[in-house]
Design a protein with these regions (language model features):
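Amphipathic terminal alpha-helices
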Residues: 27, 34, 318-321, 325-371
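N-terminal Rossmann NAD(P)H-binding glycine-rich loop of SDR-like oxidoreductase domains
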Residues: 7-27
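A conserved pocket-lining segment of Rossmann-fold NAD(P)-dependent short-chain dehydrogenase/reductase
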Residues: 105, 209-236, 240-244, 258
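Mid/C-terminal beta-alpha module of Rossmann-like enzyme folds, strongest
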Residues: 244-318, 360-370
C-alpha cells in the first residue's frame, strides 16, 4: 500500500525546518509527514535527516521511527522530477521552509527561493486538496524604510528597498504566491533573526551567533552597546510554526515570529551573558565604530578572529553592522493573540550559545551564513 502522508515539509535539514521536525517528534506526530530532502536515494536522505535531528536533541530510539518511505528525494530546483510522486496526492498541509539562506550573492537564491517555491506551490495546488500552505519567510523582507516597530503584514510594495538578495527573494515569492494562486490557503510566517536554542545553544546551528562573537573580539561594531536587536531562539520559532500549522482556524494570514520591543535584548546584556561563559569580564573598552573605521583594523582580523577571509569578514561587518544600528523591532501581537507564549530574550541563553561555540572558530561558524 502506498504511503499516504498528510504533511509535506521542505527544508527539514535546515535550521528552522529541523527544529520544527524535532517538535513533531516531541509531539509524536512525525509518522504522517514526508520530507523533501536533497539526495540521490532515500537511504542517503534518511541519513542526512537523522544527523540533523540528532543535533536538535532527538534520541536514537526516537529516530528509529523514521521510515524510508518518508523521504522524498529532490530539491526546489528540480520540482518537475518529484511533483508527480504518488505519495503527494494525499497531502493536506505544506511547510515551505527550504531556501538558500546565504547572505552572500549565491547564484541559487532566486531559482530556489522564488522559482522553486512557485513551481512546487502550483504543482501541489493542482494535485492536492490543501488545507494550509505555511510559507516561512523573513521579517527582514520589510525593507530598509520600514516603520519601527514593524507592523505585521507591512508591505511597501515596489518601493521596498531590500537589505539583501536573500530578503528580496523572500519578499518576491510571497507576493507572487498571492497573485498567482489566490485560492492557496497561504499563511506566511516571518521570523526575525533566529539565533541558537534555549536548551541546546548553538549545537543545531551557529547561524548569526558568530556576529556577536565577532563584535566582542573586535571590541568594536557600528552599533552602541545600549541598542537592542530583535532575536528569537529556534525552538521558540518551531513552537510558533507548529501552532500556525496545526491550529484549525487562524485570525490572520501573516505573522511575525519575533521578540518585539519588549523581549529584544541590547548588546550590553548579550555581552554580559556571553562573559559568563568565557569567564572574562564584560567589555569596558568597546568602541562604536563605523564600517570604514573597522576596515582600518583589517590587518588584525586574523589575530582577533582566527584564520579568515578578510573580504568576507568585511562584507559581514557591513551587512550586520548596518542592520545593528537600525534597532528594528518586529511587532508580534498577532502571534500572541493566537495563544503563543512570549519569547525568551537572547540575553537569557547567549551564555549557552557561547559554551557550545567555544571549540568552533568564528570564521568556521560564519560558514552557516556565507556558503
Amino acid at each position: 500500500m502506498i504511503f499516504q502522508p498528510k504533511t509535506l515539509i521542505t527544508g527539514a535539514n535546515g535550521f528552522i525546518g529541523g527544529a520544527l521536525t524535532a517538535k513533531l517528534f516531541a509531539r509524536g506526530e512525525v509518522e504522517d509527514a514526508i520530507f523533501l530532502i536533497r539526495s540521490s536515494k532515500p537511504e542517503e536522505g534518511l541519513v542526512r535527516l537523522v544527523n540533523t535531528l540528532r543535533n536538535h536533541g532527538i534520541k536514537t530510539e526516537q529516530l528509529l521511527k523514521l521510515r524510508l518511505e518518508q523521504i522524498l528525494c529532490g530539491d526546489l530546483n528540480v520540482v518537475n522530477r518529484w511533483i508527480d510522486d504518488p505519495r503527494l496526492s494525499s497531502i493536506e498541509n505544506v511547510v515551505s521552509s527550504a531556501a538558500v539562506a546565504s547572505f552572500g550573492n549565491h547564484p541559487s537564491i532566486w531559482p530556489t527561493n522564488v522559482d522553486g517555491v512557485l513551481n512546487m506551490a502550483h504543482g501541489l495546488a493542482h494535485r492536492c486538496k490543501l488545507k494550509r500552505f505555511l510559507h516561512i519567510g523573513t521579517a527582514m523582507a520589510c525593507g530598509l524604510d520600514s516603520p519601527n516597530p514593524v507592523p505585521e503584514g507591512y508591505n511597501l510594495g515596489k518601493k521596498t528597498q531590500h537589505f539583501l538578495e536573500y530578503t528580496h527573494s523572500k519578499y518576491e515569492v510571497e507576493q507572487r504566491l498571492k497573485e498567482e494562486l489566490p485560492d492557496l490557503p497561504l499563511v506566511i510566517a516571518r521570523p526575525s533573526i533566529v539565533v541558537g536554542h534555549t536548551k541546546l545553544g548553538c549545537k543545531p546551528s551557529g547561524s548569526i551567533f558568530w556576529v556577536f562573537r565577532m563584535a566582542l573580539a573586535l571590541k568594536a561594531f557600528p552599533c552602541a552597546l545600549d541598542q537592542k536587536i530583535d532575536v528569537v531562539p529556534v525552538d521558540y520559532c518551531a513552537d510558533a510554526l507548529y501552532l500556525l500549522l496545526t491550529k484549525p482556524k487562524l485570525k490572520y494570514d501573516s505573522y511575525h515570529i519575533s521578540a518585539g520591543e519588549k523581549y529584544s535584548s541590547n548588546f550590553a546584556e548579550i555581552d554580559k551573558s556571553i562573559a559568563k561563559a568565557t569567564g572574562l569580564p564584560p567589555l569596558t573598552n568597546y568602541q562604536q565604530k563605523s564600517y570604514e573605521q573597522i576596515l582600518l583594523m583589517k590587518d588584525q582580523f586574523k589575530t582577533l578572529l582566527g584564520e579568515c577571509n578578510r573580504r568576507i569578514v568585511a562584507k559581514a561587518i557591513k551587512t550586520y553592522g548596518n542592520f545593528s544600528t537600525l534597532e528594528l523591532a518586529f511587532d508580534n501581537q498577532r502571534l500572541i493573540e493566537e495563544g503563543m507564549s512570549e519569547p525568551t530574550p537572547l540575553a537569557k541563553y547567549a551564555e549557552l550559545c557561547e559554551l557550545t561555540s567555544k571549540d568552533i572558530s568564528i570564521s568556521e561558524q560564519m560558514k552557516f551564513d556565507y556558503k
